[in-house]
A protein has these predicted regions:
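Short pre-catalytic strand/loop immediately N-terminal to key active-site residues, enriched for Gly-Thr
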Residues: 7-13, 191-205
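Conserved N-terminal subdomain of the carbohydrate kinase-like
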Residues: 3-6, 26-109
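N-terminal basic/disordered segments at the start of proteins
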Residues: 14-30
Length: 265
């Protein structure tokens, strides 16, 4: 069985973060492991508190994982401090990790920045050059490129700039401000659009975590990047179309929509 590791924050409501990542990885047929960057107290209406991991206690589980069940792919989500970013980069290089998917969680749904400037600098300096693919949304792509994105042409310019600057593929997600379901993959000097059907579901908590984890899962299984993105988009469309309705705010998707059998009844 192929394996995947998520390095991200914990969401107490289970809709995003490592909980969404591990459900997604399991649903996509790989064995899921985790290293926690932060504990959060949150639900579908918002985040009330965050307790960040220490650099030492992030490094320890990474050592434990890489020296025992080596991951075939790694997904990196929310990492809020420069010190933690440095530890992650050191461990990934030490163990020669492959198929690294970076979801640069930098901007909250409200538009507020989630990373301090030194953490953004560390992310760009330490992690982005290690990535096989980076999955920014529009606000994150604007921060990384220094550009304002208002249309598909702007997405292409920003993705090209980021890809060339950091030497990685970039999947620029069009759900913010530009369109709802079309994403752009830029790599090796060329762009490819992945068109998706808009699903009218207000419960979208954890979509970014889910997409990046699904991509990592498919890379772990040996699919190339184009196939991994295509399969990940199909999976997230199914999770949204299942129309799970939980909580009083923007609720989670049904990550296990395809799960059937005696134990689900």
């Amino acid at each position: 069985m192929k394996t995947a590791l998520t390095i991200a924050g914990s969401d107490s409501s289970g809709g995003a973060g490592i909980q969404a990542d591990m459900k997604t990885m399991t649903a996509n047929g790989v064995y899921a492991m985790s290293a926690v960057t932060a504990l959060t107290a949150q639900n579908t209406t918002g985040v009330t508190d965050i307790l960040e991991s220490t650099p030492h206690f992030l490094g320890e589980p990474l050592d434990a994982i890489f020296t025992d069940i080596f991951p075939d792919a790694v997904k990196i989500g929310m990492v809020s401090s420069a010190d933690l970013i440095v530890v992650i980069a050191e461990k990934l290089k030490q163990y020669k990790a492959e198929n690294i998917v970076v979801d640069p969680v930098m901007v909250a749904t409200s538009g507020a920045k989630l990373l301090r400037d030194d953490a953004v600098e560390a992310l760009c300096r330490e992690l982005l050059p290690l990535a096989a693919v980076l999955t920014p949304n529009i606000p994150e792509a604007e921060i990384l490129s220094g550009m304002t994105i208002t249309d598909a042409t702007g997405m292409e310019a920003a993705a090209k700039y980021i890809s060339e600057k950091y030497g990685c593929a970039v999947l620029c997600k069009g759900g913010h401000k530009v369109n709802d379901a079309d994403d752009l993959l830029w790599r090796n000097g060329f762009g490819k659009w992945f068109h998706g059907k808009r699903i009218d579901n207000p419960n979208t908590h954890g979509t970014g975590c889910t997409l990046s984890s699904a991509i990592a899962s498919n890379l772990a299984k040996g699919y190339d990047l184009d196939e991994s993105v295509e399969r990940a988009k199909e999976y997230i469309s199914g999770a949204l179309a299942a129309m799970l309705d939980l909580g009083h705010g923007s609720g989670p998707m049904n990550h296990m929509f395809a799960l059937k059998g005696a134990f689900t009844e």
